[in-house]
Amino acid sequence: VQGNLTNNATLTTQAPSKVKFSGAANSNFKSNGATISNLEISKNNSTVTLTDAASVSGVLEFGSGTSSKMLLGANNLVLGTGASASGHDADEYVVTNSTGVVQKNYTDNTYTNQSFTFPVGDASIYSPLTSSLSGTASGANIKVKVTNADQPNRATTLPEATSYLTRYWSVDATGITSYSNVLTGQYNTSDDIVGTAARVKGSS
């Protein structure tokens, strides 16, 4: 697909089929509730914007060296229980530029250090968040978005308050008991740090 894609009927995709966006023009994608088996974003220095929520059951793939991004706006991108993401890097990723989130669903199971990297960033900087989940999942999901701003609830009275990131990740976990999670976010040291990097502390 090199232009816009709007599903006005019943769209059925099965592995190993995929919906692939390519070309140099920006595209809009409206799935109207259909679940896509595999979705590839291989635009040439351009974007794919969701105009409603989208669901992927297989692989969300970004083409290497294409400088292509998916813009969520107010819409969620849902990755199913068996879904994965590949090819994301500093030039190819999901932009959480409004209220939309990347949601990863989990099979009902007990997990120990189950790793998944959310391929998110803002309009200009790739800021993935890796989740290492432990706990028992039942109808579970984790939602993630990144915001290029000072965290609004950041402590300002502690001695370390003069050193902080001007970027934060919002994480919402649902349906997980005995929940623990090691979260590792990537940020840009030249753009995102105020003060001294060694004094920056994370919080939840």
PLM region spans:
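Extracellular beta-sheet-rich ligand-binding/adhesion modules
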Residues: 1-203
